[in-house]
Amino acid sequence: MNPKTSCLILEKDDHIAGYCIVFSEKLIQRAVLATDVRIDLEASGSEAKLIQSGLELAKTRDASVAHLCLGSETPRSAMLEDVGFHNARTYLHMLWDEETPPDTKIPPEYSVSLYTSQDAQKLTDIQNAAFTGSWGFCPNTAEEIEYRSNMSNTRHECIVFLENKIDVVGYCWGCLGPNEGNTRGIISMIGIHPDYRGKGLSQIILTAGINKLNELSTDGISLHVDSNNTPAIKLYQSVGFREIDRLHWYEYTF
């Protein structure tokens, strides 16, 4: 993503008052808009025009759909609907902040390993296998995965694989982020290969990921999950996650 061609700036009185970044995912003809404005301009005509400009930019890049995410407490929902968006999905923001991490019980035919700098293709393969076809997911290349795994909020030891003697069967991609002066663990992606679903492996890789992040963070562990994904929500609740907020994904169709 080139900020010079993908970031739109809103100016008021010769000062920057907001921005809209357009992330293009050409493989699935999607654009994701990340926007923020000065608090007194939220839901204003100025913000609406900024978002409309972002949509125009997305259209020039052959996007067929655009998505934008909002938190639960915001006056901007009605503004987005006026622009032409509709609420497509709701995600739960869940937090684990138990004193004792759950036990990781690994069957003898499986093992847990940590990501290394040589594992970009391995991580690419399991992530694409686990999520291709899922709502909002754009398949990755090994180059993209390598870049993301070396970002400042990611440590290699936060990325955990579950394997048997033949395959990588699942993974948990964790990262770290600041939260009110502390460090919070974040489970950004967790998935099981389609060939190994229904075997109870999700809980194994989840608890392994929690334990690793718990060693490195001091302010709990958070994740986002589709509110329609009842099995995943029950799994997270079973190890101590609780809902703390909701995120709403809005969709615009060109």
Task: List the predicted regions and their residue ranges.
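A conserved beta-strand-loop-helix scaffold within acyl/acetyltransferase catalytic domains
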Residues: M1, C20-I28, G136-T183, I190
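Conserved donor-binding loop and adjoining core beta-sheet/short helix segment
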Residues: M1-Q52, E56, C172-T183
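Residue-level recognition of the GNAT/N-acetyltransferase active site
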Residues: A34-E42, G71, H193, R197, ...
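Acyl-donor-binding surface of acyltransferase catalytic domains
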Residues: V37-P108, Y250-Y252
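Conserved acetyl-CoA-binding loop-helix of GNAT-fold acetyltransferases
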Residues: A43-E56, M189-I192, G198-E215, I233-S238
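Conserved hydrophobic beta-strand within the GNAT/NAT acetyltransferase core sheet
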Residues: A66-L70, I187, I221-V225
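Conserved active-site alpha-helix within GNAT-family acetyltransferase domains
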Residues: G71-R89, Q203, S227-D245
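A short beta-loop-alpha structural element at the N-terminal edge
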Residues: S111-D125
